[in-house]
A protein has these predicted regions:
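Single, function-defining residue in the core of a domain
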Residues: 2-229
Length: 229
């Protein structure tokens, strides 16, 4: 699973210059600079396979693509809708790794071939322009379902997933939907990282971003592997 989070770092000029700090609607600055951390985590063990840090304003997608250096054939990579992109699908596909990711609500897929389990086959393109120009797409399978709240029927959440596992007979939609919700294990890993291991005013101690901060953050993720076990 790939996901990201933001961590507070000490309020030094160097940290603020390298990593930045969020603003607010009122124009005030955050009390501390922040670093963005993107991690590749194994669902069952919470093992952190790989991690990258970047400035707060840099999007997770850029770093997530670099984390694909650590995926291998036979893995099933899961991601949330914020990481959905043609580039992510293409890069994962090129690594020989299967994927299962959530689709943003504003992204549409045509039902090209209806499958018996309710899912359907479609195609993903880099952009609408390239689609019109006949750019070769990647075939995907789309799974749609709704999760209902047992006590609040009106509180429904609609999910749409995209996957490289095209065979409904081998990989039924219900099985993949249940599998996807293991993605929340990455939230538990982040909780362990931030709350249990980094329970201090700022998550990273170092005042120097390029040396101490990187080393401190990497040591923390390695420690989390031991803690998670």
């Amino acid at each position: 699973m790939i996901d990201g989070t933001c961590l507070d770092i000490p309020d030094s000029d160097e940290n603020a210059r390298v990593f930045g700090r969020p603003g607010s609607r009122t124009g005030t600055r955050s009390a501390f600079p922040k670093v963005r951390l993107v991690i590749l985590v194994e669902a069952g063990t919470h093992l952190i396979f790989d991690a990258l840090m970047c400035p707060y304003k840099m999007g997770e997608r850029v770093r997530a693509l670099k984390l694909l250096r650590s995926v291998t054939p036979g893995m099933l990579l899961m991601w949330d809708r914020g990481l959905h992109s043609y580039a992510m699908v293409e890069a994962t596909f090129s690594k020989g790794c299967e994927y299962l990711g959530r689709i943003p609500s504003n992204v549409k897929f045509l039902n090209e071939t209806q499958l018996d389990d309710g899912s359907y086959l479609s195609w993903i393109y880099p952009s609408g322009k390239l689609r019109k120009k006949g750019f070769k797409p990647i075939q995907v399978r789309v799974i749609e379902y709704i999760i209902e709240h047992s006590e609040r029927p009106e509180a429904q959440i609609r999910y749409r997933l995209i996957t490289s596992l095209l065979e409904a007979e081998k990989f039924p939609a219900q099985l993949l939907a249940c599998e996807y919700h293991q993605r929340w294990e990455v939230e538990n890993t982040i909780d362990e990282l931030k709350v249990h291991l980094l329970a201090r005013k700022t998550h990273i101690r170092s005042q120097r971003p390029c040396i101490g901060g990187t080393r401190n953050l990497w040591f923390t993720t390695r420690t989390e592997e031991l803690y998670g076990h």
